[in-house]
Amino acid sequence: MTASAYLDLLDELLRPGIAGLSAPLVDAQVRFVAGCQRPDGGFGGRQGGSDPYYTDFALRVLTWLAPAHEAFSRTAAYLAGRSLPPRDVVECFSLLSTRRLLERQRVGQDKGTVPFSASPAETTDENWDSPQAVLPGQLGFRTLATLSAPALDPLRLTEWLYGRLLPSGGFARTADDPRVSAYHTFLGALCFQMLGVEMPAVEDAVRAVQALRRPDGGYAELAGQSASQTNATAAALGFLTMHDGMLAENMAPAARFFAQMQSADGGLKPHAAVRGGDLLSTFTGLLTLWGLDARQQIDAAAVARFLRGAAHPGGGFLACDADDAADVEYTYYGVGTLALLRLWSTAP
């Protein structure tokens, strides 16, 4: 499976749920995300200027909800002005993912369509406790103005990635930390595949990530850590599935781990020591449970209630109801979780 295939399959999975979002909800999210664009065309977080990380998340949301938005052309100019090399594997992924989204818009324009678009349904968003009530609808397409995705030197990025690989396989979080990271290895693998280059020493990386598995069925983020983490587990399983390294006997324990992470507020916790859920953990956990065919492990109605509490009245999503500000990253997780809940409600 290529990274483009992996990311395209993710979009295809979420497409039916995205397509049924109500017009007021779509408009609120688009206004919020577009309002986070900086004068240079990039997007920022809660503080500071443009950052490739937040720019990627913003374009993902707009690709879902408003693929003809003028923000795309402004972002193309921002990305064209970025200098290489990236700061870390996360930024490398963000740059390549942003370029991929801009290229999708260009291809869609050439065909007279856009590759992904929400077609708002005539529904209200009052009853989020019922996932099926939130997300009925169907897909539509729109015409898109001409866009050009800026070029990123694939040779330079490939050489940069080679230089960040650990001798034991996979990627670390920083150059100063020799331990393999589940999250960075997953993103690094996606980077190689978006570049059309085979990841070196995949077998070593698979063994290194497999070694992060813990007795409760989850995975730690780093070697030497004793506690499993929701997002590390999702990243590890994503990487292992891509490279045929997921052992069948480990699937059910992983599903049980995610189920144990559902908190009293309905969201999934980042790890067992935290009391409440957050949208990042909720989205990645639900997405992975879907891939494990273990939907029955989670109370979807409780997730819907958690999601309603994380929705900001003016658009955007918070990390959880105790958060005080929305941002484009958590808006991506919020919209994605809405789409997953639609899948939950319609699956046989």
Task: List where the protein language model places each region.
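An alpha-helical repeat/solenoid feature that recognizes helix-turn-helix modules
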Residues: T2-S22, R46-H69, L84-Q109, W128-R156, ...
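Long, well-ordered core segments of solenoidal/helical folds
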Residues: L25-G41, E70-R87, R106-S130, A151-F171, ...
